[in-house]
């Protein structure tokens, strides 16, 4: 495509189109969460986030490059999102972005990020108050990351304790807790405001490098499909097209093998299709799956 080589998460039916998370050969990495409270105009043609990220991966090396990239894009940008970026020089920031402007949130600012990290779901802090989505999931993640902090943040712990978490902060329940487990009753539970949801299609942890390290060591840990029924595969840009066959497009399945198998297991978990059945998950089956996809689920 020209520019930097990159590795990205794409839709199975559009591999040359939008990129939803990715890293390039310089260690620059990007992701986004959709925002639902930042748009302040009536422009109809939107949803260019994935195309924006694909372009950024080709031309950006640093967080500052991304900022310049946003500055020079034609308006309207046709996005409403929180873009998260890191680089190989210690840069880390979110950019709350709408059609005309962006608001930078620097993860290295101790006043803004005293714990050294920022958490986003589907609203922007600069957006309209109490609009947007994901407020309960935001509180879930805050608690999970606070508890995780003392033991250190590793890809394995983030996948296990966040991506596969069934904690709900508003209800103060954790389905992984033996005493609160739905297995004590029918084995079924209503899915509402957990981090993994029916519509979840992947979970990715990008393990960056410290300043001075080889940016080729930047690792894109990738779990395709429904995160609780998937496994994480490490990927590197330098491998080019020689990535694991589990995560690359398979014409026989019209998706990646890992995604296909994960979704088959997910279908068993969300097996009720009449009425409001898709709001219910079969925890007993999911628990059995977690025993195999997770190193140490709680009893």
Name these PLM-found stretches:
Residues 292-299:
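Conserved small/polar residues in nucleotide/adenosyl-binding loops
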